Amino acid sequence: MLVSYNWLKQYTNIEDNATDLAEKVTRGGIEVEGVEYLADNISNVVVGYVETKEKHPDAEKLNVCTVNVGEEDKLQIVCGAPNVDAGQYVIVAKVGATLPGIKIKKAKLRGVESQGMICSLKELGLNQSVVPKKYQDGIYVFESEQKLGADAVEVLGLNDYILDLSITPNRADALSMRGLAYELGALYNQKVTFADSEVEENYSDTELKVVVESDSCKNYLGQVVKNIEVKDSPLWLQTRLMNSGIRPINNIVDITNFVLLEFGQPMHAFDKDLVGNSIVVRNAKEGEVLETLDGEERKLQESDLVITDGTKPIALGGVMGGKNTEVSNNTKNIILESAYFNPVSIRRTSAAHGLRSDSSARFEKGIDPNMQKAAIQRAVELILELCPNATVEASVGVVNKEEEKEVVISTSYINNYLGITLSTEEITSILESLSFSVEVNGEELTVKIPTRRPDISIKQDLVEEVIRIYGYDNLASTLPKFSKTTKGGLTYSQRAIRDLRKVYVGLGFNDTINYSLVSDEESTQYTLDNHHKVRLMMPMTETHSTLRQSLIPGLLNTVQYNVARKQKDLKLLEIGRVFFGSGDDNIQPKETLYLSGALTGEENSTKWLNESSVIDFYTAKGYLEVIFERLGLDEKVSYKKEKIDGMHPGRTAEVYLGEKLIGFIGEIHPVVASDKDLNETYVFEINLDEVISESKVKPRYEEVTKYPEITRDIAMLVDLVDEYQNIYDVIESINSKLITKIELFDLYVGPELLVGKKSIALTITYSDKQKTLTDEEVTKVHEKVLKALDEYGAIIR
């Protein structure tokens, strides 16, 4: 937002220069992105009067003008502007003058001497977007008589500094001069007062009828002004608008824009003779079309709020007026509109039509719902000032006054929050400087919040206001106060996580961090249980709309990204949190720490000394078991073949810690891999919180046995569908302390075997830490193993 320094000074007694003011405003919480002096690099530019204009004798498009600049000698100036003419008051840059990027010298143009230049506004540095259309292709002409030789910089209001403010969405009140005046009053500890409208309220009755049929319109005022004269605005009004980044159009439109800047209240003027006596505010109907003021024909949607004459749309409410009721030079009677529209409705309409305006920008952020009457009175006052013969009818419409919110807070609450000591009187003074009403009862303050400040609703908001005005720089730098200190250190869980990261990085894994937000579809992929989703209310994109319930989708996307860039051998690890909703919006989602891995390609693929090996299920399983070995849980872990959505139906297993399901491991389903252009890819995922909580035991060290081990091999036939885990569990069920190791060393499937059978061979290791085992002792236990396997259904070979 562009703000005039000179305009601001009309509301407050500011002595600071523009740069110091900008610094103070920024420290108060409203960022000033820049300060520009409009007359920078402009000198020796004055007001002149064109006394004569003659055609250049040797150039068809040039004119030779005699210009009076209030000096004894008249200036001869050659000018090529198509709109220059005798009898005009113009801007003259004399010889020796400087303009942005130009220094004026005496010159000859096609043989005729020129003693200066008649200037356009663009040549003075004004942006073409704010120059009145009638002067865009030529020089600027003053509409009224001016003092000859007067400094054109002062006459045009260019002796002004423009502050470029970056207004955050919560501070819509600062999108107006009055709102900024309140802010400056608080920052400089000055009382801000505004002159009431001088317009008498004894207007004649009106025939205008206003009907509001949409909930998106809370307040709507219409007021008829007759017998106006549409013409160019006076210079003071034009310069106010141009300095604020708005192009002057005509006096009526300029007044509505001026009130927009002054009050922050968007307004609109309709040609009453094109509207009639009826205004109906409603939602658009299917098939309705409106040509807006920018000349675009827009097909309306049922969600659009429109202003109608009772039959057809005449404006897109809060966004832009319609071409069919535009104020023109022939307009004699107008209807002024001052309304409060729902911010969400305006934002939706603006986005749907790709149409933004100064009005919609303010409605979207939220304006003061009690400002409509004051704004329309100010507009009427200005119209009567510029059109003395105009007559005004009484305003009519729907007004729902909004009550001021109250927030109760205490002095101690503010001081405790900020870590400072302010008295109740000091806090009250700060809040009252913001034009808040404060009722004091001991140290308790009941603060009434003006309706222009919708951003303030809770105690913390008031704390922020106090420290903004008190000054962040006034906070003393102090060390925290501690009654006692405790030695810092990592928790068991933190140490375990750090240790696992180091181990996996040492094994060649890349530690990965992915977004916690995924698409709605991805949020429930690769989950073992059904949980409620945790969705954002207003996601930036649909691909990042829901909190993840598994780390696998993010890892697979990372694998896909890298494989597409020719990184085919990957081992990725991620330790991160997943989120499970409860189905109750009032209950926080449960956060659980997971560990996941993804592997694809080969190992040792670039090592000349070792043969490469393709990553398979057992490669992934070996890496997963590193976790359990590090945490001393390897004997408690078991695997169960299972089908999981998105995983290969024959190469996937659930992982159990005791009787508790903690995760899974397996190959990504070939269809999923094909969709992502991946080769065989294996993943594993476990609930790390569960694993760490089970491992919270101190490590126990045992002496390596001094006695020899005895091994016995067993070969057997089992069903093809039998899992090795089942065989392992049968042997473990013997529950003999002498069995210290069970290893699978051979697996065979072939036509020589019985139909539906496979051959497996195991080595069982027996040992005793206290003595050397005898053959009889080993045989006794081994026979129990054979019997258990026989009962299971295995055929011992």
What positions do the PLM features span?
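Phosphate-backbone binding interfaces of nucleic-acid-interacting proteins
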Residues: 1-198, 335, 354, 358, ...
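A carboxyl-terminal module marker
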Residues: 2, 433-436, 514, 585, ...
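Short, hydrophobic beta-strand segments
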Residues: 3-8, 159-168, 218-226, 358-365, ...
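Glycine/proline-enriched, intrinsically flexible loops and inter-domain linkers
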Residues: 4-5, 63, 188, 193-288, ...
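Conserved mixed alpha/beta core segments that line enzyme active sites in large multi-domain catalysts
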Residues: 47-77, 250, 256-324
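Mobile "lid/hinge" segments at catalytic clefts and subdomain interfaces of large enzymes
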Residues: 113-127, 134, 307-406, 562, ...
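Terminal amphipathic helices with adjacent charged low-complexity linkers/tails
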Residues: 188-211, 387-413
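Extended, well-folded interaction surfaces typified by the phenylalanyl-tRNA synthetase beta subunit core
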Residues: 407-411, 415-570, 712-715, 765-767, ...
